[in-house]
Structures are given as C-alpha cells and as structure tokens.
C-alpha cells in the first residue's frame, strides 16, 4: 500500500516538472523578493517550490553565476542567507533554481534585486553664484535603495526651509536675490537608514554691497558721477561692509596668473603647497601692495610685496575674522606667492583664495581652491580595559574611530563576530559595546576593529566583572578595656575578587612586621586580636577592605582604662542614695546641654549677622557707592561663580590646625595654605574690569578654553601692582604680630634673636636677593600693557575649573622677574578671564625656531642669527631662577617647556603657562587616562602614579635645556610614538642623552635630571650654580 502511494506521488511530481521547464512561477509556493539592506546587516532570500521539498534540489545564482557558499554566504534548506552584506560583493540580482530529482526538470524564480544602503560622506558644491542667485548642491557618497536620501541645509547653525528667497529642490539649495542677511556658512546633512552625516566643509557666502569708501587723503573730493545716488553704508562691527567693491578696480597689468587648484586631496601628515603666481609691473614696485591668503573668507597670512610702507589693516582683517595664528607649519613664500604646509592636519581643510591688495583699489582675487584632508584612521580615544559591576543595569565600553572615509566599527570577542557576542551584549550604531544586566560570563577579552578603505586597526580591552567590596561584619565601637586585658576587633568582607583586609592605627599601617607578634594576631578572616593590652595601644583603629572594584573603610576607637581607675564604693549611703545621685547627675547634665545648645545658636546667629554687616561695608567701600554687592547681600556668589566659589577664607585669618595624625603636605606636591588676614575671597582681590582689555586676538586653545593676546590699560596694571604690594605688606605685618604674640612675655631672647636675624638679612642683601624680591614696575609712560588672556569656557567641567584654580594659585603667590605676573581676573560674566603678563617677542619656542631659520619672517629679508652658547646658557639660567622661585613658594608647574616660556626684546625670559594643547602644539600632547599630557616632558612617576613634585619639574627642565641646545627644531624622541614613549617610560627603558652642543661641564648634572629615583635628581639652585659657572667658563674662552 505504501509503495503504491509513493509511486502515485512520484507520477504527480513528474507531471508537474514538465521539460523543458515550468510555466511562469506556478511551481513556486514562495519566490525571493527584492529588498534593500543596510551595509553589514544580514539578508535572507526565501525560496520554496512544493511541499515535497525532499524530492527537489535548490541552487542560487548571483548576477548569472552560481554562488560559492562560505561562512558568510550559505544556504539554510532552500533559503539563502547572507551575513554582513557588503556593497562591493553582494549587490545585484539573485535567482533561485529548483531541480526535480525524479525528472531532472528545472525552473528558475524571477530575479530578486539586492540593494545596499550606506552613507559615507557629504560635501557642498558651488554650481553658480552671482548678484541674482546662489546655487549650491549637496553631493553625497551613499545610497538609500528605494527610499530617497533626506537632505537638510543649514546656514551657520540655523536649519533652512523653503521660504522667502530660499528654495530647496532635492539635493540643491537656491537663494534668489541674496542679501547681507543671507551671509554665512552653508552646510548640508544627509540621512538614511544607515545613519546621518554632515558635510565637513561648507561654503562661505558674503553678499556684495556697494558702500561709500572712507577718504584716504585729507580734503579728497567725491567723484561728480556719484551725485545724489551716494549712500553711507554702516556694517556691523567686524564685517567688511563691502567697502572694497566701491573702490576702483585693480590695474589690468596687475594680475594673478595661477591660483590654487580647484580641488586638492591630501593625506593627513603629508606636505602641500597652494600656488598663487602673480605678475607685478615695474611701475608698481614702489606702491603699497599686499599679497593675502584667505581660508573660508578669513585672513590667514599676508606679506608686503611693494617697497612702500605696509597697508593699514581693514576692519574685516582683524578681530574675529582673522586667523593670524603663529604656526610653524605654514610658510608664505614672497617670491612666488605659494602657501606651503609642512604637515597637513585635519583642521587645515577648507576653501583657500589668494588676493592682491593695491592701496586705493579693490582687491584682485584668484579663483578659490578647495583643500580636502584624508584623515588618518585612528582611535579617538584609545579603548581601555574596564571593570564592570556585577548585576549593573547598563555598562558601556566606548570605541570611537576617525578617518576619511568614516570607518566602520565592529566588536569581536576572542575572535568571534558580533553575532556570537554573549546574551544581553550589543553594539550600537556609534560602535559602543553595551552590556545589559552584567553577568559573570561577560568577562573576557574584546577586540574593537575599525576598518575603511585605508585599512584596519584594532584594540583589545579586558572586561572584568567585579563585585564592590562590602563589610559582612564591620568593626563596632568604641571598645573599652582595662590594662592587661584582651580585645577582639572584627572585620570581615565579601566581594569579587576576594577583598584584602588591612588594619591601621592612627593612620599607620599595622602588620606582623611592625607589631609585637606575642600580643597582636591577624586572623585569616580579617579579625584583629590584641592580648595583654597596654596603655599605648589606645587610639583609633581603621579597617580598610579593597579589591579592583574599590575601597571601603570603617574606624573603631579603643579606650584603655588603667587598673586603678573606677569609682570607690559608697561607705555610708545605701542603694536609694545611689539612685538619687544618678538622677541628679543626669538632670544636671541634660540641663547644661540644653543651655549650651541654646547659647551656641544665639552666638552663631550673632556672628552670622556681624559677618554679613562687615561684608556689606567692604563691598560698599570697593564699589564706591551706597549699594552693596548683590553677591554679598544675597549670598548668591556661589551660584553665579560655581568654579571659584569654593576658595573662600574663614572668619579668621588663621589657618586651621591639623590633628596629630594628619601628615603635613609636602612642599613638592601642593601649594602651601598660607594664612590670610583678609576676610574677602582671594579671587575678589584679583578682580579686573573686562572693559580694561582691548584688541584681543586668539592665538590658540588650551585645556579649559581659548587663549588670547591683548592689551590692558596701564592704570589697571599699576592698580594691580599696588594691590599686590598692599597684600604683601599686610601679610608681613600679620606675620610679625603672630611672631610677637606667640613669644609671650617671657620670650625676650626669642625676640632678640629674631631682630638679630633681620639685621643680618638686611646687612647681607645680595644682588641675587634683589632679583628675587624685586617686582617689575610697569612703565608709566606706556598707555597699555601687552597681556595674555586665558578664558575659562568649560564652566561646568569640574576638572577644567580645578586646573584653572591651580594655575591662579600658582601665579598669584609669586613675585619674581623670572615668572610672569598675574594682573588679575575678569569674572563679571562667563567666560572668566585670567590676565597674565606677556612680552613683545612672545613664545620662546617660536623665537628659537625663528633663530634656527624654521619660521618664515614675512617682512625680514633674512632670518635672525642663531643663538650662541652663552645666550642659550643665559636663557636656561633665567628659567632656572624662575623655577627656583616657584619651588620656594611651595608650588609645582607641571608643564615646563619652551612653548610655555616667553621672551622679550630685552632678552628677558619668564616662565609662563599658555599651554596651547588643543591646536598649535597638539602634537606635543597626548590623551592619557582621559587627560591631555605632555608625555615627552613628564617624569615616569607622573605617568604611572599621577604624582607631580618639584623633582618632576626638574625632569622637565632637563628636557627644556635639551630643546634650547637643539633650537626646538625637533621633538624629544620624535622617532617614537606617544604610546611607545609611555610604555618605555613606565618600563624604565626610555634612554635620554644630552644635546651635542651642550658644554661638557653641564652634561653630568643634566643627565642626573632624568634619573629614575626622584630623590637623586638635583635642585634648581644646584642647576643655577652649574649654569652660572658654565657661563663664566664660556665667557673666559
């Protein structure tokens, strides 16, 4: 019976598979469907001919060719599965072919098309620009399948829509009759299922306006042709106002033969050159002609071509529209107008244009050129290993990569792809590895891979699942015992890894090596047992538990009673008397406590009101009016200034006393907390009005904000100097009063000794002492003082605020000619400004590069001569004296290098703190543990333990002297990457050698600056003495 049924089925199947093929798709129950898949996601094509699948064989064709199956593309039954679709390999038509095993008949399904959705980059292209319209196109490298790309346009930061004279048509933006209100930076964004990208470079548009030019000469008359149609056009501050368009055109024989190329694609780190070949007629040789290079419409570099005086600057060539930053990478060649880049960085991308400016004529512009930078593939920042708390709801490990084109990021676990990651572990679109409900099986090694057309990079991190240590049996106290008794203090903990337990007494660690083993026993479960207790055992005992997840601590007080202590029994009274006595004592103590509390409340209220009254009086005196400062009367100073409100003095000028157990802070690790007699905030004493600053020009960006160079009114400089003198006088007066008061009436010998020492100091004052104590007075004849202004932009970043306060405290307490002065602090509104002394020659490193011939001097015919050995020694000696002053003020610098020193035209060098770590000197900093650090100048203990001392400044000073003798033309260990420098420094294998030009008498002491043991390094006074002897020996030769 079964055989008959099988034969009938075979006959029906054979009749279905009619040669040469089946009719249309009637034989298919399910055919593959066309689909669009996001790149790197999976795709599935279904195919089913009849319910009797066991008598059919299925094959798949891709673009007419049979598919070769592998681990990524494979068949599941009759269906086709593609893992991680790739657009270069998988795009096309897919056909399913079913073959009958009985008859051999074949039938093919209709082709199903696979489209890959991806999105790489976007850029803005100029299609046309004139007075009547502006036409831009958003060019996108990507595909969206059947769905259109979503294009959005932005002017500056405002999103545009079709309204008024703005029209959006698919990928194009049309602005009809553009006006000054349409000026700005135009950028576009593109989005689809694969993500969203914004154009890295945009198009800067500036409307052309006919305006009245200013009179260049006295009594100059207007042309009659202007007549009544002449209007005065006032533009906003910083704008050009279109004045150039009203000037007469440039002569025809003055022309730019060749401008920058239309589009230039350069890899990051390579060199590049933008050409601007010009022709200058002989009759214009003595005219005022200036060659300018602009980037995105802003002035970048300029050089005088003619023999006359320089052309006065225009309003649009200064202030915010100028990019005249000191950058040794950029060189403008006067002979041919070429702008060359020594090493391209990502921020160099943009639109460049050169122009010739002849006095009294409109500028002659070249055609614009677009410079695009192929950013190197790298992790920003490098992924790091992490400890995850067990049962945490969400934990993330970030992996961000940058490059051109944008890289694709994926995570692997011990060689497996994303699909085989553990349960509840996923990767989001930004490449972040997300753990949900962390479990023990999540621990292991994970590798982040970033790939693009440049190649592939990877970083492996270790994920460890831990449990924060907790006390299962905490120590309980206080504990009282008698002398020669026994005490057991329990301390047990749980956690993963198993926590370690450490006991200490009065903050001094206890172990079997420093205790009496016959009396002290440390049990395995963490319990501490003390037998035969002595009086000296009394104190505060602490139990600290910890593992890789953290530390916890509990204290217990041990009180030891002498065997003779206690109350004698009452001889005459009975039990009733004892009870009555106990009740009376209890009631007396309670009443005294109540009276004490009420008295303290009244006293505190009185003191608070008196303090408010004194603050109001001080604020009225400072303001010179009758209204007190709102920050004092309302008590809102801390809300208005969250960064600087924590540094306040107490009610008295005396420092808080420390307990015996508190270790005194080292003078090498932190600034000492000196007593202050003033009750105002130390930062209120530094306040300068923001209106006193002028001509601010940004020179770079630091860790907590922008850095400017500007000018400060001389009257404010004199006021700042006088306030510093008053503060020093008041401090000396308070110190003398404290010294006399502490001696008492019976300390006449002490006062005599003090006066004798003062007489000796006055009689033995040397030139070195005068140099150290003397404060530089500002020139009274000068109306303005050149200053360096550091802005605190990251007001809500606690780490940035802490560094801002540290630099304020560093420079506030030092008055030495080798260290720049802190003129004051502008904090009426955000951002806060720190105002420091600056010099006319500026950055010491740029000065060294100029003397070495590495910096282009636009107006000079030849580079300045190189420094002699005696001059280099003089510079090093001045810096050593300044650093010695910082050491004696019990502070550390932490970033000593030639870039952070300034030099004047009088060859006076001062230690400063510009710290331009974000752009100008970004190559000299490296992000380590989420902080930008000058790793090539840091001592090993700074990198390993984050421990900064004067000895670490000595290490950096040795590197600075190495820079001086090398003219700052190369970086320390420039053959190594920053990661390799960190690794070798931590391993102790980083070898230092002095520069070749170093005198022999200095080599030994400079090599000792780089010793691994900080205690073996010399002091700044020893370095100063060695430099002084070296200068004498060089002078004698």
Curated annotation (Swiss-Prot):
Protein kinase domain: residues covered: 693-1031
Residue numbers on the Extracellular membrane side: 24-582
Per UniProt, the keywords (alphabetical) are: Cell adhesion, Cell membrane, Disulfide bond, Glycoprotein, Immunoglobulin domain, Membrane, Neurogenesis, Phosphoprotein, Receptor, Repeat, Signal, Transmembrane, Transmembrane helix
GO BP, sorted A to Z:
animal organ development; cell adhesion; cell surface receptor protein tyrosine kinase signaling pathway; positive regulation of neuron projection development; positive regulation of phosphatidylinositol 3-kinase/protein kinase B signal transduction; retinal ganglion cell axon guidance
Membrane-topology descriptor: Single-pass type I membrane protein
Region called Disordered, residue ranges:
623-683, 720-777
* Residue ranges annotated as Cytoplasmic topological domain: 604-1037
- Attached carbohydrates are found at 336, 418, 430, 445, 513, 525
Where the record annotates domain Ig-like C2-type, the positions are 24-109, 110-199, 251-365, 368-464, 469-559
Q: Name one GO cellular component term.
A: plasma membrane
The Swiss-Prot or TrEMBL record annotates one GO molecular function as:
signaling receptor activity
* Modified-residue entries (Phosphoserine), positions: 681
Q: Name the InterPro entries on file.
A: Ig-like_dom, Ig-like_dom_sf, Ig-like_fold, Ig_I-set, Ig_sub, Ig_sub2, Ig_V-set, Kinase-like_dom_sf
Name a Pfam family for this protein.
PK_Tyr_Ser-Thr
What does this protein's UniProt record list under function?
Acts as a calcium-dependent, homophilic cell adhesion molecule that regulates neural recognition during the development of the nervous system. Component of the repulsive Plexin signaling response to regulate motor axon guidance at the embryonic stage. Also component of a receptor complex that is required in the adult visual system to innervate the lamina layer; specific targeting of R1-R6 axons.
Name of the protein: Tyrosine-protein kinase-like otk
> What's the source species for this entry?
Drosophila pseudoobscura pseudoobscura (Fruit fly)
Q: What is the lineage of its organism?
A: Eukaryota, Metazoa, Ecdysozoa, Arthropoda, Hexapoda
